[in-house]
């Protein structure tokens, strides 16, 4: 890679090869299944340096991937023998409290954004695990605890700076390169390297009521009875949420209420009365909200992330069957006991305000995400775990799902996810724009738009 170093000579970019200090850390990912031996890792600090790295890769026909948070379990941010552009040195955040905007560099994680915005009493819709990369979550849609009030992360994206496959650096917004901006919001991983995001921010001066609850599994019918009232709350549901499901031998619930303690405790009284074995719920600053699930989303070990959509009400019989399947799996494979399945209820009211064709993201509807993280240690179980996970998510989609038109949330799509399932009616326009902005399909590791 001497030619690459020469190509970047005079810049502040770092080039790491397998014999470089720091290389091993640079290829670590959230899942050990995605730790690949890249030929080189480039760590730029500017869009111009990103452009140089992209240009080198394309000129020498070197496979290229982009790394931000590294949470993809499909390997989208890892490369065996190719070039990784890691944005880890681009984590600056600038908040404009007067304009209520947040400008975040492409390598930021949500912790960076949450903390910077909180200084000014502001927040935006971000990831519910705060070490997730801003770039990956945003470009695939982006659900968060504030989605009920403010929509998806992409609904709050005002502008982006992107490096294209041909090295050009473009600003994209509703008024500049609007077709590219349309594509970035939902399928952006396929169009270039986004080095800067500008988000709309909202006042968030108050603390929020949030935390974790854990129950023995016999509480399942009572928990579902409460969950199935979620849509009965009317407009009030926009400021609350509950993620619930199972991990190990327990039913877990992460709850959120954007308002005073007294109102929150009234709302969640049916859950609190069930005598949870663990209760960490209290009033916390908003910037701590997206840490409450971190203990279940640690780095290390082998992982596979997948998902489905569901509608309410959820039937006790079906959910018990799903729980039985899960418990049988961890009894057969005890090392998978940290596997978690979460049903994520945040209001879709604001999400549905945006038309389906307004941007590339194509799975808006009156349904909710299910996130499923299988965790194990033995590489020999990779295919078995993925197959069992997919069977479980197919069962969820078939029995409690949202219909054939909405099969997959992009950020929860699996290794073999079909682009038609993710982008639906927006796929033809996406493929046309792909031909315009990346005709040689340089950016293809995440839901390949041009598989042929």
From Swiss-Prot:
<comment type="pathway">
    <text>Secondary metabolite biosynthesis.</text>
</comment>
<keyword id="KW-0285">Flavoprotein</keyword>
<dbReference type="InterPro" id="IPR016169">
    <property type="entry name" value="FAD-bd_PCMH_sub2"/>
</dbReference>
<feature type="domain" description="FAD-binding PCMH-type">
    <location>
        <begin position="34"/>
        <end position="204"/>
    </location>
</feature>
<keyword id="KW-0274">FAD</keyword>
<dbReference type="GO" id="GO:0071949">
    <property type="term" value="F:FAD binding"/>
</dbReference>
<keyword id="KW-0560">Oxidoreductase</keyword>
<dbReference type="InterPro" id="IPR016167">
    <property type="entry name" value="FAD-bd_PCMH_sub1"/>
</dbReference>
<dbReference type="InterPro" id="IPR006094">
    <property type="entry name" value="Oxid_FAD_bind_N"/>
</dbReference>
<comment type="similarity">
    <text>Belongs to the oxygen-dependent FAD-linked oxidoreductase family.</text>
</comment>
<dbReference type="InterPro" id="IPR036318">
    <property type="entry name" value="FAD-bd_PCMH-like_sf"/>
</dbReference>
<protein>
    <recommendedName>
        <fullName>FAD-linked oxidoreductase pyvE</fullName>
        <ecNumber>1.1.1.-</ecNumber>
    </recommendedName>
</protein>
<dbReference type="InterPro" id="IPR050416">
    <property type="entry name" value="FAD-linked_Oxidoreductase"/>
</dbReference>
<comment type="function">
    <text>The subsequent chain release by Dieckmann condensation (DKC) could be catalyzed by the TE domain present at the C-terminus of pyvA and/or the alpha/beta hydrolase pyvD, installing the tetramic acid moiety.</text>
</comment>
<dbReference type="InterPro" id="IPR016164">
    <property type="entry name" value="FAD-linked_Oxase-like_C"/>
</dbReference>
<dbReference type="Pfam" id="PF01565">
    <property type="entry name" value="FAD_binding_4"/>
</dbReference>
<dbReference type="InterPro" id="IPR012951">
    <property type="entry name" value="BBE"/>
</dbReference>
<dbReference type="InterPro" id="IPR016166">
    <property type="entry name" value="FAD-bd_PCMH"/>
</dbReference>
<dbReference type="GO" id="GO:0016491">
    <property type="term" value="F:oxidoreductase activity"/>
</dbReference>
<dbReference type="Pfam" id="PF08031">
    <property type="entry name" value="BBE"/>
</dbReference>
């Amino acid at each position: 890679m001497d030619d690459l170093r020469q190509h970047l000579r005079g810049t502040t970019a770092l080039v790491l090869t397998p014999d470089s200090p720091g290389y091993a850390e640079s290829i670590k990912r959230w899942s050990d299944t995605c730790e690949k031996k890249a030929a080189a890792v480039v760590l730029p600090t500017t869009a111009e340096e990103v452009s140089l790295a992209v240009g080198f890769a394309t000129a020498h026909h070197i496979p290229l991937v982009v790394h931000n948070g590294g949470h993809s379990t499909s390997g989208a941010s890892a490369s065996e023998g190719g070039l990784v552009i890691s944005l880890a040195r681009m984590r600056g955040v600038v908040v404009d409290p007067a304009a209520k905007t947040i400008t975040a560099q492409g390598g930021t994680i949500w912790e960076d954004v949450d903390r910077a915005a909180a200084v000014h009493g502001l927040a935006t819709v971000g990831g519910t695990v705060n070490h997730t990369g801003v770039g990956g979550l945003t470009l695939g849609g982006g659900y968060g605890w504030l989605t009920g009030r403010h929509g998806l992360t992409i609904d709050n994206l005002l502008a982006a700076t992107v490096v294209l496959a041909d090295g050009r650096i473009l600003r994209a917004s509703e008024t500049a390169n609007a077709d590219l901006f349309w594509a970035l919001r939902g399928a952006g991983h396929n169009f270039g390297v986004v080095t800067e995001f500008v988000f709309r921010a909202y006042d968030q001066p108050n603390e929020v009521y949030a935390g974790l609850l854990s129950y023995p599994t016999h509480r399942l019918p009572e928990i579902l009875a409460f969950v199935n009232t979620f849509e009965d709350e009317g407009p009030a549901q926009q400021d609350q949420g509950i993620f619930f499901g199972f991990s190990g031998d327990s039913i877990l619930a992460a709850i959120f209420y954007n308002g005073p303690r007294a109102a929150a405790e009234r709302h969640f009284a049916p859950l609190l009365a069930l005598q949870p074995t663990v209760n960490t719920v209290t009033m916390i600053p908003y910037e701590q909200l997206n840490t409450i699930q971190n203990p279940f989303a640690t780095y290390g070990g082998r992982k596979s992330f997948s998902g489905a959509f569901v509608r309410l009400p959820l039937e006790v019989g079906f959910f018990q069957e799903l729980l039985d399947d899960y418990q049988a799996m961890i009894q057969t494979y005890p090392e998978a006991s940290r596997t978690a399945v979460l049903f994520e209820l945040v209001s879709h009211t604001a999400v549905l305000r945006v038309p389906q064709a307004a941007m590339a993201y194509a799975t808006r509807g009156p349904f909710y995400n299910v996130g499923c993280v299988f965790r194990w240690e033995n590489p020999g179980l990779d295919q078995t775990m993925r197959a069992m996970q997919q069977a479980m998510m197919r069962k969820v989609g078939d029995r409690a799902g949202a219909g054939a038109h909405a099969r997959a949330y992009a950020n929860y799509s699996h290794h073999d996810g079909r682009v038609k399932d993710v982008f639906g009616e927006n796929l033809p326009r996406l493929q046309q724009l792909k031909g315009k902005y990346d005709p040689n399909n340089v950016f293809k590791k995440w839901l390949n738009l041009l598989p042929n």
